[in-house]
């Protein structure tokens, strides 16, 4: 693990140095009229509409448009009277610089006015995905009346986060902000639901291959329904590699698949290295792959007799293992983390696991009518339970740990965790070896039962008295 961390760090520093040099530009001023094509959907903040664009000279620039203007979509053209670009490297906050680098933006611009030209015939797959998501959101509007419940469904099920910021702040305070952002967790819930329905029907290796194809198709359909967000594409790509390796009979080692998928994505777009979501998602998966077997194995033997307690212990082990390697990264980027994250994630993940499949089935396959309204009432009840769970943790108070660490401090923490992991791994191997030896010796003694009337040969009596055995036995 230490070698893996050092190799990953060296590769990361190499990519970061080359990508920063690629984005480095001086302050640029466009005096005349300039045009920019939108590359992302507009994200509405308190004061601006934030949208990533590409100028006519090929530069990617993050525009902050006034809220009073029309909301642009992917593929639309913005005409600006004049624009001054502030370079990315001149941004004072390191986290904001990393955010711009993750998008490939070389600078920021704040135009006071603009003219919008809608795209007539857009061939963008992302724009098509967003239009599909918008139609599903309109069905949610007809299904749920409460604004807070709609905000939860928008974020948890479809990755649309331009609604209630109050709900998002509550999730963030209890350490469950990742549930509000569609990612690998949500795709995993959908895929597991499909697998749970179809796995009992599988009885041969050929059917298992067809199940892998269905799982891959469901993963990419879910990515399409959520607007082809980057975290969902990342998770679908990783799942695709894992299932292809299974179909072809190749080793499905999670760390190998994880490393290969990260290498491919960074080769396509090196800016992902600066994306906090990219860092957290890969670090969480690596943490689960390394620590979940240790945590779960420790208590599984003792809790095997009670399936319910064993299942709950598995959730606790999963929650703990996912946070071992993500906490140093969170402290480095944000300087704080929630102490309730360990416990709040268990009920919230369970409730989300029921909410996401139910919402998708309702809005995709159930026509308007009595059943549609009944399922809407069940969905609204689940959203209310989620809000009550969050409120119960908020009422406890004092759940924030505020510690800001530097890059060197973060690397030191990871080296300490790596050393501790190696020590625990060695201890587990020694304990397992002792138990295997002791268990085999005990089974050997129980399997060999000497009869009471057993007569030993004479030369064995001689051995017990200290004499040498004869050279030949007649």
Listing of model-derived features with the role each one plays in the protein:
Residues 106-238, 243-244:
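Aromatic-rich juxtamembrane segments at the membrane interface
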Residues 228-418, 422-434:
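Internal transmembrane alpha-helical bundles of multi-pass membrane proteins
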Residues 95, 151-154, 168-169, 359-362, ...:
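Short coil/turn segments at secondary-structure boundaries
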Residues 1-27, 108, 124, 128, ...:
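N-terminal leader/targeting segments
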Residues 33-38, 48-49, 54-58, 64-78, ...:
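Non-globular, low-confidence helical/coil segments that flank catalytic cores
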Residues 50-51, 89-90, 105, 186-189, ...:
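Short hydrophobic/aromatic residue motifs in ordered secondary structure
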Residues 40-120:
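OB-fold single-stranded nucleic acid-binding module
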């Amino acid at each position: 693990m230490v070698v893996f961390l050092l190799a990953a760090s060296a590769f990361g520093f190499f990519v970061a140095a080359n990508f920063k040099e690629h984005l480095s530009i001086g302050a640029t001023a466009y005096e005349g009229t300039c045009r920019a094509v939108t590359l992302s959907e507009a994200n509405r903040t308190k004061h601006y509409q934030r949208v990533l664009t590409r100028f006519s000279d090929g530069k990617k620039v993050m525009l902050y448009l006034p809220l009073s203007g029309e909301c642009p979509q992917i593929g639309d053209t913005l005409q600006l009277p004049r624009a001054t670009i502030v370079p990315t490297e001149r941004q004072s906050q390191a986290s904001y610089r990393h955010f711009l680098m993750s998008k490939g933006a070389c600078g920021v611009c704040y135009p006071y006015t603009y003219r919008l030209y809608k795209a007539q015939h857009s061939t963008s797959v992302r724009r098509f995905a967003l239009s599909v998501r918008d139609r599903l959101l309109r069905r949610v509007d007809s299904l749920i009346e409460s604004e807070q419940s709609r905000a939860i469904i928008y974020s948890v099920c479809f990755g649309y986060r331009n609604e209630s910021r109050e709900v998002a702040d509550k999730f963030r305070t209890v350490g469950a902000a990742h549930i509000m952002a569609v990612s690998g967790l949500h795709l995993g819930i959908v895929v597991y639901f499909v697998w749970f329905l179809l796995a009992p029907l599988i009885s041969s290796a050929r059917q298992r291959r067809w199940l892998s194809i269905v799982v891959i198709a469901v993963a990419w359909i879910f990515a399409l329904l959520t607007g082809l967000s980057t975290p969902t594409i990342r998770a679908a790509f990783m799942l695709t590699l894992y299932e292809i390796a299974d179909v072809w009979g190749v080793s499905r080692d999670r760390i190998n698949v994880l490393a290969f998928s990260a290498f491919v994505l960074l080769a396509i777009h090196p800016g992902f290295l600066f994306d906090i979501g990219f860092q957290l998602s890969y670090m969480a998966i690596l943490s689960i792959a390394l620590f979940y077997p240790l945590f779960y194995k420790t208590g599984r033997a003792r809790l095997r007799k009670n399936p319910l307690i064993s299942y709950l212990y598995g959730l606790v082990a999963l929650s703990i293992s996912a946070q071992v390697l993500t906490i140093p990264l969170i402290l480095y980027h944000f300087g704080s983390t929630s102490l309730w994250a360990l416990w709040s994630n268990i009920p919230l993940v369970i409730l989300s696991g029921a909410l996401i499949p139910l919402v998708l089935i309702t809005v995709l396959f159930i026509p308007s009518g009595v059943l549609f309204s009944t399922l809407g009432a069940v969905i609204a009840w689940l959203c209310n339970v989620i809000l009550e769970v969050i409120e119960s943790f908020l009422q406890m108070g004092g759940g924030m740990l505020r510690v800001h660490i530097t890059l060197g401090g973060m690397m030191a923490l990871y080296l300490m965790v790596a050393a501790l992991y190696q020590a625990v791994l060695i201890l587990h191997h020694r304990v397992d070896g002792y138990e295997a030896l002791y268990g085999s010796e005990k089974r050997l003694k129980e399997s060999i039962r000497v009869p009471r009337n057993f007569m030993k040969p004479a030369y064995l009596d001689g051995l017990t008295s200290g004499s040498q055995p004869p050279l030949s036995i007649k």
